[in-house]
Amino acid sequence: MEVNATLIDCCDPQKPSRVLFHFLILDAPSPSNLPTYIKELQHRGVRHLVRVCGPTYDATLVKSRGIDVHSWPFDDGAPPTRAVLDSWLKLLDTELARQQEDPSVPPPTIGVHCVAGLGRAPILVALALVEYGNVSALDAIALIREKRKGAINQTQMHWITKYKRRHQGAGCVIM
């Protein structure tokens, strides 16, 4: 059984060879494929798994393998809530600060999943591309859709095109 995963790298525009974040967009695991899913997360070096849908599996099994699980659900087809947005950016800021404090710390791989991996998970990754990079909202959507067909609906696209960045800085690209 294969895990449906799409890797997107966020790189520093001042130094494009420097990866700030690896994002892994996924669909939700089920109890039956959770062992395979966990192996894939470990193989990819995932340190954080962000679940933006309702629980479909026992998160303690993932946590027992050294992966932090963040459960920040929001409505299917909708943009993230303010609380989810704040939690997501706080996680990314914390990981970026770790790298700045110790340049030998490798960039984190952060898994993000919703039910199908087409709406809620990709919109958070698109937000990271916009927020931490010099990537426009439409370019972020196009980059994600190039790798993950059908990602991000019209409601989410409209929201991210109106989004105002909080940060100035690093750039993100698909590798």
Swiss-Prot record:
Modified-residue entries (Cysteine methyl ester), positions: 172
Lipid sites, type S-farnesyl cysteine: 172
GO cellular component: cytoplasm; cytosol; extracellular exosome; host cell cytoplasm; kinetoplast; nucleus
Subcellular location field: Cytoplasm; Mitochondrion matrix, Kinetoplast; Secreted, Extracellular exosome; Secreted
Keywords: Cytoplasm, Disulfide bond, Hydrolase, Kinetoplast, Lipoprotein, Methylation, Mitochondrion, Prenylation, Protein phosphatase, Secreted, Virulence
Variant or mutagenesis effect after changing residue 114 to S: Loss of catalytic activity
EC number, UniProt record: 3.1.3.48
Entry protein name: Protein tyrosine phosphatase PRL-1
Source species of the chain: Leishmania major
